[in-house]
Amino acid sequence: MSSGASVSALQRLVEQLKLEAGVERIKVSQAAAELQQYCIQNACKDALLLGVPAGSNPFREPRSCALL
């Protein structure tokens, strides 16, 4: 029973390695350039860079009623 589980685990490992071997690889310099370009293009939509408008911030402290 243990050898059956071992064979099954090895078969899964072989399948995983086949999948990983089929992944297209690119150079780190190319990946870094693409990532940098992506960040520059999407900086205008990044809430961490621009901040969240006070009116639409779901994490702000709730205000108390001014009438009370």
From Swiss-Prot:
PROSITE patterns tied to this protein: G_PROTEIN_GAMMA (PS50058)
Compartments reported by the entry: Cell membrane
Post-translational modification Cysteine methyl ester, affected residues: 65
GO annotation, biological process: G protein-coupled receptor signaling pathway
Lipoprotein as UniProt keyword: yes
UniProt topology in membrane: Lipid-anchor
Family classification: Belongs to the G protein gamma family.
Subunit and partners: G proteins are composed of 3 units, alpha, beta and gamma.
The protein, known as: Guanine nucleotide-binding protein G(I)/G(S)/G(O) subunit gamma-10
Organism: Mus musculus
